[in-house]
C-alpha cells in the first residue's frame, strides 16, 4: 500500500519521489527527472512506464511504445534488465521517450505468478492500452510488440 512519501530505491540516497494520486481512477503517478510510472494504489499493478531517452530536439520519433507481457520491477527511478534493453533500443532509434505498456498489468518477476491472480490484467489496463494505441496512430511513434 502506498502511504506517505516514497523514497528512492537507490542505496544510501534519501531523495523524495514526487507522487500524484488520481482519485478518479485510483492511480498513483511516480515521477522523477522526466521519467514517470503509473501504479495502482495497492502497488500490485503498473499501468505504464515512461523514460526520457534523449535530450534536445533532433528526434526521429517522439516515442517508442513497447507492448510487453507484464511489468516487473522497473519504475521512474530504475529499469529492470528487459526495460533496459528497450531503453537502449529507443536511444538507438533516436526517439525522445520510451513508453512501456503491458498486456497484463500485474507486477511479477516471474510471469507464471500471474496464474494465481484473480485479475492479472488490472482494472485500468485495457483503457490505457487503447489510449496509447490511439496516440501511436496520431503521432510518429514507433509501436513495438515484444
Where are these regions (language model features)?
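Glycine/proline-rich loop-helix segments at beta-alpha junctions forming the active-site rim
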Residues: 2, 20, 108, 113-146
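Soluble or luminal CAZymes and related metallo-dependent hydrolases
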Residues: 41, 78-82, 121-128
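Short amphipathic alpha-helices and their capping/turn segments at secondary-structure boundaries
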Residues: 48-58, 78-98, 134
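Short connector loops at secondary-structure junctions
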Residues: 96-113
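Catalytic phosphate/metal-binding cores of nucleic-acid and nucleotide-processing enzymes, i.e., regions
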Residues: 73, 85, 92, 111, ...
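Residues at the starts of beta-strands that form the adenosine-phosphate
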Residues: 63, 96-97, 142
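Active-site and ligand/interface coordination hotspots across diverse enzymes
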Residues: 2-80
Amino acid at each position: 500500500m502506498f502511504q506517505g512519501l516514497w523514497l528512492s530505491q537507490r542505496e544510501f540516497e534519501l531523495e523524495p519521489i514526487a507522487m500524484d494520486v488520481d482519485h478518479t481512477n485510483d492511480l498513483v503517478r511516480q515521477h522523477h527527472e522526466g521519467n514517470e510510472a503509473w501504479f495502482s494504489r495497492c502497488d500490485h499493478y503498473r499501468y505504464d512506464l515512461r523514460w526520457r531517452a534523449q535530450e534536445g530536439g533532433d528526434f526521429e520519433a517522439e516515442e517508442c511504445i513497447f507492448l510487453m507481457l507484464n511489468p516487473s520491477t522497473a519504475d521512474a527511478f530504475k529499469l529492470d534488465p528487459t526495460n533496459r534493453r528497450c531503453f537502449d533500443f529507443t536511444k538507438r532509434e533516436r526517439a525522445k521517450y520510451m513508453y512501456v505498456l503491458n498486456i497484463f498489468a500485474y507486477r511479477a518477476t516471474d510471469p507464471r505468478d500471474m496464474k494465481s491472480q484473480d485479475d492479472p490484467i488490472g482494472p485500468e489496463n485495457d483503457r490505457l492500452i487503447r489510449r496509447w494505441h490511439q496516440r501511436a496512430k496520431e503521432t510518429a511513434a514507433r509501436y513495438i510488440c515484444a
